[in-house]
Structures are given as structure tokens and as C-alpha cells.
């Protein structure tokens, strides 16, 4: 786990810190081209990442508006079985299974059977 964090930090710093070439004598030929706000934001993000890793939380650093929406299971509301005839109950379960299995979410047969019955 520690190695993955180290690799993540190295990748983040090397990809987020573009360098410009400087030919001035007496100076390093590479100098960071980041503005201070960008560098501060990067340091803050890495600090949060390391703190979350230390706490055992998942490293989701994206802003809330940039996060992918959570996939929710569709709520399958079943009418009371006492209200329906036997044929109507069978059709509702079959229809529920059909829509569950052919839906975008990709539930297994067992998951659909649990939700629909």
C-alpha cells in the first residue's frame, strides 16, 4: 500500500509540474513553471491524499461536482400481493425480472430474483 502511495505522489508531481528550460548561466536548466496558486493547490491535494491514506479512507480527491454520480439500485416497488390475482402476480414478477436483467446496471440473475420476488 505504501508503494502505491509513493508511485501516486511521484506521478502527480511529475505530471502536474511542467518544467521550462532556462539557459541562464549559474542556474539550474530546469525551473518549475507553476504559479504559486497551482503549487499550493497541489500541495494541499497531496496532503489530503496522504491524510486519507493514513486514516484508511478511499483516495477520492475530486471536487464533489466532478465526482461521478453514485450508481443507485432502482427501487422496485411491488404492490401488495393480496391485491393481485395469481396471473397478475406472475406477470409482474416476470416483467420485473425482464427489466432488471436487460437494464443498464447489469444485475445478475440472483440479484434480480432477490429484488423482484
Curated annotation (Swiss-Prot):
GO molecular function per UniProt: potassium channel regulator activity; toxin activity
Tissue: Expressed by the venom duct.
Organism superkingdom: Eukaryota
Compositional bias of kind Basic and acidic residues: 62-79
Residues in the signal sequence: 1-22
Protein keywords: Cleavage on pair of basic residues, Disulfide bond, Ion channel impairing toxin, Neurotoxin, Potassium channel impairing toxin, Secreted, Signal, Toxin
Note on domains (UniProt): The cysteine framework is XIV (C-C-C-C).
Family: Belongs to the conotoxin R superfamily.
Protein's recorded name: Conotoxin vil14.3
Natural source organism: Conus villepinii
Amino acid at each position: 500500500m505504501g508503494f502505491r502511495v509513493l508511485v501516486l505522489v511521484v506521478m502527480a508531481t511529475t505530471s502536474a509540474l511542467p518544467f521550462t528550460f532556462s539557459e541562464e548561466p549559474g542556474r539550474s536548466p530546469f525551473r518549475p513553471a507553476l504559479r504559486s496558486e497551482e503549487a499550493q493547490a497541489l500541495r494541499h491535494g497531496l496532503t489530503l491524499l496522504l491524510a486519507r491514506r493514513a486514516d484508511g479512507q478511499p483516495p477520492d480527491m475530486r471536487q464533489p461536482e466532478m465526482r461521478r454520480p453514485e450508481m443507485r439500485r432502482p427501487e422496485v416497488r411491488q404492490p401488495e400481493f393480496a391485491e393481485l390475482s395469481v396471473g397478475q402476480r406472475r406477470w409482474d414478477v416476470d416483467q420485473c425480472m425482464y427489466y432488471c436483467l436487460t437494464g443498464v446496471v447489469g444485475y445478475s440473475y440472483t440479484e434480480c430474483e432477490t429484488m423482484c420476488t
